Amino acid sequence: MKLTRKMRIKNALGLHARPATVIAKLLQGTSSAVSFTYRRETINAKSIMSILMLAATRNSLITVNVDGTDAHETMERIFQAFENKFGE
């Protein structure tokens, strides 16, 4: 199943090293393909370096795409991470 959702970055420093690591670790156990799109650039969200290269700042809208058998669960986990400011 393929799901798409827009999420806003709420933490002060945007998608820097700590949030990128949180996201990559969160996605380690998922079988779904996960990508983020920001400013017409789409990246593999399981890659810390790719997330960092987006250079997404606070209040940026990220389009999250999840495609796979565990898409609902994976999307919910990503949403919670964004809502909780990646634990910051």
Residue ranges and their predicted role:
Residues 2-3, 19, 84-86:
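A broad "ordered helical/assembly scaffold" signature
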Residues 2-6, 61:
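Intrinsic-disorder/low-complexity, polar/charged segments enriched in Ser/Thr/Lys/Arg/Asp/Glu/Gln
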Residues 8-49, 54-57:
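Compact, glycine-rich, soluble single-domain proteins
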Residues 1-2, 42:
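Secondary-structure boundary/capping motif
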Residues 53-88:
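C-terminal structural segments of small proteins and small subunits
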Residues 3, 29, 73-77:
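Long, contiguous binding/interaction regions
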